[in-house]
């Protein structure tokens, strides 16, 4: 065993030894050690290779550790530098000494010099082929251990050479960049040497901005724009002081200059091109050497201006840039989105931590004492029908250094626009129902223009500020407000604020505060007002005829441009055009000193109307109906016959408010108070332009200062009286608005009831004020003194130019009329609408073909005197501007109180007034002719809007009953047809009254001078004007507004004015078609169509809707479908305020009170329907519901001047309201009545057919309910071009009612013929258009042609045209007649006689007979219904189917029988009254809704009161007086009076204005008697 075990062990050992031997043998070979090390390294490297993710993770961890380590030693610094180099893909190595670290690439290297302790010594950068150059910026970064910034520089250097090609090509590209940088640096030095500009000047104006040379990895930087907010420290809110050594790189907007590879080849200079060191011209343009092959090279690269963040630019900007550089901006076509959406994203992305914000384009701004909500209407259509599109631009290509200054200027322009829009974009979140939250709508008008619409700070109306970014440092601003709106501030003030802050919220806050300060300053003017009032009482000028504004009635439409659109110049022969032109609100009107004087002096206006327009107006006795007398005799001609006129012309110039406050943009503003679009609408009405140029919306502005002062004073005196509230509202705006604003604002609801008690004294006072002409030098002196004092007064804002102008604007828009309308308005109270006669006044205006226009000129204020506006204006806008300039408006504070009242009632109470009654009576006959008022009322606007519209075209709305009618007549006498004006806007007394007033004056001045006198004696005319204010009680507003409006601006009733022939339009009862308007509908369309219907409409609680109804009643049936569409459209867009259709839709209430179903809608009164819709919108704020109480909105007010379109625009942006339709309103409003489709058609119609046709077209297009409204106003053009513009305006704004001027008598006749009346109030604009048809006051059936847009009635209209083809007194009126297309609903035909009686009572002569087509439904007055169908509610004749009571008929206006209270009087004018009633009745829902400030309850109460009064009046007046609810039902109310009474406001104020049926009834006879007997 042992041996065996040993053997095994030995074997093992041997085996092991053999293995060891083999191992030893193997590894004993000669293998070098280096080989072994290499093998180990390879093994180690293979192990290190891990997944790429893991590797990156480790690297990031190492870098994080590196950053966390403090660099305090040389090794730590070199390690960090090497780490940074690796991060940027660069190589790095250390010098032998270890104190230099080199970071390298193929094209450059960076040398970092350190000391042994690791401290930095220097940093040098060496580009390819160059010596290293020290870079101070990199030295600073590394010394501060700011390694992140150092890394950015390295990245920039890498990107600089991120070019195609080899190193040689890259070197050439670098040389090209260097040469460009040298040239740009020379340009910067040249600019600095030439201007010694500070850093901020370089940024904003420098040819290459503030230039920072390329340094390290930072490219050459051009700082080209910095907004004021950029210059505030974000943390401390303290201003950043810029100096050469302290201009933060991140400040403002920057662009870097670089070169990048491109797919195309470009010849780029590789050597500097600038020769010498001095500029070649005074624009700092250097002289460049030519680009040749010697100094340039073709490279696959180009120069670029690159932006840190892509900039939103408009489509137009892209095209301009490409035209400038000659190089496509994008290699592939970009995707275009709404520009405002891009701007919103751009602004929100500035937040360092941008979180998604669900804004829906609604943003909130919390400012000291105010909270704003801004709705950016990104989809609003531009004039071309497209929304404002844009795209993002991140870089701009260019080849030559000389292109850089041009590019920078273009970018600055775009960025300035973006800055303003972006100022609304905040991340602030507020609750929708936050108390006091103010709504604003920002809507694009073009690539450089936009509008901001908001509620008037004082009045319940829509105001629009149009901002035009002319360049990066100049922003022109224009405030569009209702003529009767209180003063807000001047355009210059707004422009200064905008340019100082470049922020919309800050500007809106400043505007509001400015309005408040102006309002606060009003009381200081009370003493002056009293003095002026006394003077007026002692020196009452003769009542002036409505011809004043008409002087340019036939003026061809000179091309007018509105912020939004440009209307092609074209002859708009009728007043209508003038109305539109009025809008000259452009202010472009500058026919001469005389004209401005005219526009400034209501008295002067009335005088001119009487002398010059008497013939030209439809019913003017001198001119045969078929003649379209020269637009009104030239001013010179008119002045020859009137010494007083001569005096006014002499005195006014120097003391003209325009002159006194001429510098103040307010005047210009007010003159262009119409919506931006309205301006476009305003056509060639030179007279209007003249008048409106200064203060289209505020005639009084144009009035002599005396007039302005008187009205202001009277307003002041009356301010204590409730009636004054309403009255003042309208007047204050017209006049300098010294007293009106306060009184208006001061007396709230109480004013409505009170008006009746105080009306007479107040009104008389007011009347005298309006007839400040008689005051002459005394008043002028006083005014001038006031103006001087005002200018001396410390302005609330330094920015504000002389406030006098604004004040004046205010007054012009409301003051004059305010005085005229105030008393009446108050007298009228609920039932007595001083406006009742306003319808008559308007009728008178209609009587003269040109009268409408002049009246419009004169009464644009009146028309614009929506009670709301006046009240609110006096409170804020009116008072503010005026006070800023001077403390003339002592009563502004008073008005403040009244404003809410008036707004609530919408001037209903104002309509009724004891004095107002008689005055209206006087004008009540004229009312018959002034059916256009109804048309105006037809406007979708609420009472205020209606009032405005009405008073412009007709005062039917105003009529609250017989009493109201009588008032209107008297008013008319006093106020040259102001009565008609006042009649127009019971609901929105102030505004509509103003509007009405302009048209009314035109038509009425001629016809109504005698009545005026009568009214003056009553002392109501001036106050009548006031009644138009939106705030005035509905009843009061209706009556007082129209008469006051016309009377105030023209001449006081007391003054002995050359007799003005009365024009009565007799319409067979059978002709009138009765509609069944719902009694409560805003404006019953049916009432408008038929006398009976009109009246019933009037009886509607809401006079404004009544009015619309009246005018549309006849029309309704034929155009039900149209109306409904229109209605809908209107509703969506503030239509109610801005569209006659809106009212009409209510009038259409015949069809159930639904806008869509309303008969008016059918005819194009659909606008009226929209008005109805508007009402609901009104809830958010008056802004939202301009048509209801917004009629007073500044843009709307300007409607009388022709800015109705503009108004529409402002109206459209109601933040609270759905933006869809409205949002578009501002853009399209001006050019066409309807915001969208309607607009274009409306404009086209207007231009083609005179004003008349446009309205019709509008109405025809349901989608264009807004357009309908504008169109209508143009239809009013027969004698009231203004109507058309109003209509457009109203459509867009809902204030268009005020826009409708009084149509000429011809227009009324035309309406009667065609039964177009139906559209009257309801589709204020549509009616206007029909009125336009009617407006061929000359009795031309031709007006139907103009109304062609209503296709249905066109043929009929044309027939009428044949009958009346010769009646072109209105100029455009004949064309208006053409609108018969809408008449086709009228089944039977009647003959309407136009009776023109002389003021002295001479036997009346029948100037023309018109065949009336009666809608199947119309009972007696075919004319009326047909006109309604044509929706010429704007025209007095059409409005009132009853011939006698046509607005144009002075006798009717004068007729004492027609008391404002008397519904019967109103019923005489029948449909006219109905229309007027609709317009007048602030009580109308439409009117009420727009007045958020004024409780709807008050409005309703007012309406009820008005209804009660009207009912009483009707009962008294006629056995067949219908109850407010009943009258609308009867096709032809047994008694026109009854129908009128139905609408308390309307009936009282506009009895004569009722539908033809009613007129044909006893009313007709009465009116005829009055016309025959004389005033």
UniProtKB/Swiss-Prot annotation:
Q: Where expressed (tissue)?
A: Widely expressed in the adult, with high levels of expression in the liver, lung, intestinal mucosa, kidney cortex, thymic cortex, splenic follicle and seminiferous epithelium in testis. Also expressed in the adult heart, brain, spleen and skeletal muscle.
Q: Where in the cell is it found?
A: Nucleus
Q: From its record, what is one biological process in GO terms?
A: animal organ regeneration
Q: Where is this region: Interaction with the Mediator complex?
A: 108-212, 215-390
* Chain residue ranges for the region called Interaction with VDR: 542-789
- In this chain, composition skew of type Basic and acidic residues spans 696-706, 963-974, 1354-1366
Keywords, sorted A to Z: Acetylation, Activator, Developmental protein, DNA-binding, Nucleus, Phosphoprotein, Repeat, Transcription, Transcription regulation
User: Pro residues bias: where?
Assistant: 622-632
GO terms assigned for molecular function? chromatin binding; chromatin DNA binding; DNA binding; general transcription initiation factor binding; histone acetyltransferase binding; LBD domain binding; nuclear estrogen receptor binding; nuclear receptor binding
Tell me the residues on which Phosphothreonine occurs.
805, 1032, 1051, 1057, 1217, 1442, 1459
Q: Where is this motif: LXXLL motif 1?
A: 604-608
Where are the residues of the annotated region Interaction with ESR1?
Answer: 16-590, 656-1066
Q: Where is this region: Interaction with PPARGC1A and THRA?
A: 622-701
Positions with biased composition (Gly residues):
976-986
The record's region (Interaction with TP53) falls at 1251-1423
Q: Which family does it belong to?
A: Belongs to the Mediator complex subunit 1 family.
Give the quaternary structure: Component of the Mediator complex, which is composed of MED1, MED4, MED6, MED7, MED8, MED9, MED10, MED11, MED12, MED13, MED13L, MED14, MED15, MED16, MED17, MED18, MED19, MED20, MED21, MED22, MED23, MED24, MED25, MED26, MED27, MED29, MED30, MED31, CCNC, CDK8 and CDC2L6/CDK11. The MED12, MED13, CCNC and CDK8 subunits form a distinct module termed the CDK8 module. Mediator containing the CDK8 module is less active than Mediator lacking this module in supporting transcriptional activation.
| Name assigned to this protein | Mediator of RNA polymerase II transcription subunit 1
Organism, as annotated: Mus musculus
């Amino acid at each position: 065993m042992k041996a065996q075990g040993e053997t095994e062990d030995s074997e093992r050992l041997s085996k092991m030894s053999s293995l060891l031997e083999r191992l030893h043998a193997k590894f004993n070979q000669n293998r070098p050690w280096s080989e072994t090390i290499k093998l180990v390294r390879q093994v180690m490297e293979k192990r290190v290779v891990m997944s790429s993710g893991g590797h990156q993770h480790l690297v990031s961890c190492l870098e994080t550790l590196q950053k966390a380590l403090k660099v305090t030693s040389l090794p730590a610094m070199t390690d960090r530098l090497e780490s940074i180099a690796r991060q940027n893909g660069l190589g790095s190595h250390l010098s032998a000494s270890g104190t230099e670290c080199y970071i390298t690439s193929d094209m450059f290297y960076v040398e970092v010099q350190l000391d042994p302790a690791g401290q930095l010594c220097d940093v040098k950068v060496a580009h390819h082929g160059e010596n290293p150059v020290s870079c101070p910026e990199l030295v600073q970064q590394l010394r501060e251990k700011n390694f992140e910034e150092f890394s950015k520089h390295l990245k920039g250097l890498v990107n600089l050479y991120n070019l195609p090609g080899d190193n040689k090509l890259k070197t050439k590209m670098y040389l090209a960049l260097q040469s460009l940088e040298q040239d740009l640096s020379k340009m910067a030095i040249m600019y600095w040497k030439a201007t010694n500009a500070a850093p901020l000047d370089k940024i904003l104006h420098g040819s290459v901005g503030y230039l920072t040379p390329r340094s390290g990895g930072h490219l050459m930087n051009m700082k080209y724009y910095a907004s004021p907010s950029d210059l505030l420290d974000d943390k401390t809110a303290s201003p950043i002081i810029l100096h050469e050594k302290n201009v933060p790189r991140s400040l403002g907007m920057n662009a870097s200059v670089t070169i990048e590879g491109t797919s195309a080849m470009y010849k780029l200079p590789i050597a500097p091109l600038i020769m010498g060191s001095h500029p070649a011209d005074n624009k700092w343009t250097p002289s460049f050497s030519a680009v040749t092959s010697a100094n340039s090279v073709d490279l696959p690269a180009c120069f670029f201006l690159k932006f840190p963040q892509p900039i939103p630019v408009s489509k137009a900007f892209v095209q301009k840039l490409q035209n400038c550089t000659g190089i496509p901006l994008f290699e592939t076509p970009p995707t275009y989105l709404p520009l405002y959406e891009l701007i919103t994203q751009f602004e929100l992305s500035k937040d360092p931590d941008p979180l998604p914000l669900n804004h829906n384009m609604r943003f909130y701004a919390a400012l000291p004492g105010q909270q704003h909500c801004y709705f950016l209407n990104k989809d609003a259509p531009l004039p071309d029908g497209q929304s404002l599109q844009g795209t993002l631009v991140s870089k701009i290509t260019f080849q030559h250094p000389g292109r850089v200054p041009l590019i920078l200027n273009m970018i600055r322009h775009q960025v300035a626009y973006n800055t303003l829009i972006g100022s609304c974009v905040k991340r602030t979140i507020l609750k929708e129902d936050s108390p006091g939250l103010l709504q604003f709508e920002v809507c694009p008008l073009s690539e450089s223009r936009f509008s901001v619409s908001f509620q008037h700070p004082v009045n319940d109306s829509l105001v629009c500020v149009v901002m035009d970014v002319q360049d990066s440092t100049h922003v022109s601003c224009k405030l569009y407000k209702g003529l009767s709106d209180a003063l807000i501030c001047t355009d210059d003030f707004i422009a200064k604020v905008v340019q100082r802050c470049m922020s919309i919220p800050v500007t809106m806050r400043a505007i509001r505060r400015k309005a408040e300060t102006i309002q606060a300053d009003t009381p200081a003017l009370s003493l002056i007002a009293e003095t002026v009032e006394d003077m007026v009482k002692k020196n009452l000028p003769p009542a002036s005829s409505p011809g004043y504004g008409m002087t340019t009635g036939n003026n061809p439409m000179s091309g007018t441009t509105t912020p939004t659109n440009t209307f092609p110049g074209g002859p708009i022969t009728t007043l209508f055009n003038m109305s539109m032109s009025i809008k000259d609100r452009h202010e472009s009107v500058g026919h001469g000193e005389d004209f401005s004087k005219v526009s400034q002096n209501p008295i002067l206006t009335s005088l001119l109307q009487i002398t010059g327009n008497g013939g030209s107006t439809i019913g003017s006795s001198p001119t045969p109906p078929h003649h379209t007398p020269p637009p009104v005799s030239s001013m010179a001609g008119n002045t020859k016959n009137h010494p007083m006129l001569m005096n006014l012309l002499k005195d006014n110039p120097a003391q003209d408010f325009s002159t006194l406050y001429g510098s103040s943009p307010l005047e210009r503003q007010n003159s262009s108070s119409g919506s931006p679009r309205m301006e476009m609408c305003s056509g060639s009405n030179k007279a209007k332009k003249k008048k409106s140029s200064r203060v289209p919306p505020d005639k009084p502005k144009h009035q002599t200062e005396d007039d302005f002062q008187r009205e202001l004073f009277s307003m002041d005196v009356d301010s204590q009286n409730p009636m004054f509230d309403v009255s003042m509202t309208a007047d204050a705006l017209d006049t300098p608005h010294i007293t009106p604003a306060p009184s208006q604002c001061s007396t709230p609801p109480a004013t409505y009831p009170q008006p009746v008690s105080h009306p007479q004294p107040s009104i008389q006072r007011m009347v005298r004020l309006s007839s400040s002409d008689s005051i002459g030098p005394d008043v002028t002196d006083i005014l001038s003194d006031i103006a001087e004092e005002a200018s001396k007064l410390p302005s609330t804002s330094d920015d504000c130019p002389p406030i006098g102008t604004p004040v004046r604007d205010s007054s012009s828009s409301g003051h004059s009329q305010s005085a005229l309308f105030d008393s009446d308005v108050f007298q009228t109270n609920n039932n007595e609408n001083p406006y009742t006669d306003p319808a008559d006044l308007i009728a008178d205006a209609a009587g003269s073909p040109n009268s409408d226009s002049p009246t419009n000129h004169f009464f644009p204020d009146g028309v614009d005197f929506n009670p709301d506006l006046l009240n609110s204006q006096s409170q804020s806008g009116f008072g503010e501007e005026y006070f800023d300039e001077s403390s003339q408006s002592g009563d502004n504070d008073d008005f403040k109180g009244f404003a809410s009242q008036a707004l609530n009632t919408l001037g209903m109470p104002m309509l009724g007034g004891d004095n107002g009654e008689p005055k209206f009576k006087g004008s009540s006959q004229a009312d018959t002719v002034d059916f256009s008022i109804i048309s105006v009322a037809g406007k979708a606007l609420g009472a205020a809007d209606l009032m405005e519209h009405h008073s412009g075209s007709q005062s039917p709305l105003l009529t609250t009953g017989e009493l109201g009618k009588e008032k209107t007549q008297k008013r008319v006498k006093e106020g040259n047809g102001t009565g008609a004006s006042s009649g127009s806007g019971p609901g929105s007394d102030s505004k509509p009254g103003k509007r009405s007033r302009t048209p009314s004056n035109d038509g009425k001045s001629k016809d109504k001078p005698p009545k005026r006198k009568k009214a003056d004696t009553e002392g109501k005319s001036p106050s009548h004007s006031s009644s138009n204010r939106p705030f005035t009680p509905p009843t009061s507003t209706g009556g007082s507004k129209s008469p006051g409006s016309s009377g105030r601006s023209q001449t006081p009733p007391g003054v002995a004015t050359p007799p003005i022939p009365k024009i009565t339009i007799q319409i067979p009862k059978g002709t009138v078609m009765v509609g069944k308007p719902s009694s409560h509908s805003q404006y019953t369309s049916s009432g408008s169509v038929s006398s009976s219907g009109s009246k019933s409409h009037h009886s509607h609680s809401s006079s404004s809707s009544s009015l619309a109804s009246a005018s549309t009643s006849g029309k309704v049936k034929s155009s039900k479908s149209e109306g409904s569409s229109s209605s809908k459209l209107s509703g969506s867009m503030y239509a109610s305020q801005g569209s006659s259709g809106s009212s009409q839709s209510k009038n259409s209430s015949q069809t159930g009170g639904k806008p869509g179903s309303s008969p008016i809608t059918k005819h194009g009164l659909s606008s009226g329907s929209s008005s109805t819709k508007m009402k609901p919108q009104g809830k958010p704020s008056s802004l939202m519901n301009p048509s209801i109480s917004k009629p007073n909105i500044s843009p709307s007010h300007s409607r009388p001047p022709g800015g109705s379109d503009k108004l529409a625009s402002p109206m459209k942006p109601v933040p609270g309201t759905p933006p869809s339709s409205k949002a578009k309103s501002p853009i399209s409003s001006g050019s066409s009545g309807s915001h969208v489709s309607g607009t274009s058609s409306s404009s086209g119609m207007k231009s083609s057919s005179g004003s008349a046709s446009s309205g019709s077209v509008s109405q025809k297009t349901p989608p264009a309910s807004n357009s309908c409204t504008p169109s209508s106003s143009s239809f009013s053009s027969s004698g009231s071009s203004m109507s058309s513009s109003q209509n457009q305006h109203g459509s867009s704004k809902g204030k268009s009612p005020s826009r409708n001027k009084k149509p000429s008598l011809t227009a009324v006749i035309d309406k009667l013929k065609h039964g177009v009346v139906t559209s009257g109030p309801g589709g204020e604009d549509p009616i206007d258009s029909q009125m336009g048809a009617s407006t061929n006051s000359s009795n031309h059936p031709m007006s139907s042609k103009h109304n062609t847009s209503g296709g249905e009635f066109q043929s009929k209209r044309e027939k009428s045209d044949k009958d009346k083809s010769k009646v072109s007194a209105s100029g455009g009126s004949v064309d208006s007649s053409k609108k018969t297309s809408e008449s086709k609903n009228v089944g039977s035909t009647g003959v309407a006689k136009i009776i023109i009686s002389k003021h002295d009572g001479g036997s009346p002569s029948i100037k023309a007979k018109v065949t009336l087509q009666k809608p199947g439904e119309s009972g007696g007055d075919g004319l009326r219904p047909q006109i309604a169908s044509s929706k010429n509610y704007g025209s007095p004749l059409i409005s009132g189917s009853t011939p006698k009571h046509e607005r144009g008929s002075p006798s009717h206006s004068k007729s004492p029988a027609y008391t404002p209270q008397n519904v019967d009087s109103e019923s005489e004018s029948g449909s006219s009254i109905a229309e007027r009633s609709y317009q007048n009745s602030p009580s109308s829902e439409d009117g009420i809704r727009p007045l958020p400030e004024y409780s709807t309850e008050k409005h309703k109460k007012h309406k009820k009161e008005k209804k009660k009064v009207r009912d009483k009046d009707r009962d008294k007046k006629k056995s067949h007086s219908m109850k407010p609810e009943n009258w609308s039902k009867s096709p032809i109310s047994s008694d026109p009076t009854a129908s009128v009474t139905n609408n308390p406001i309307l009936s009282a104020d506009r009895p004569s204005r009722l539908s033809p049926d009613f007129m044909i009834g006893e009313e007709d006879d009465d009116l005829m008697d009055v016309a025959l007997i004389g005033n």
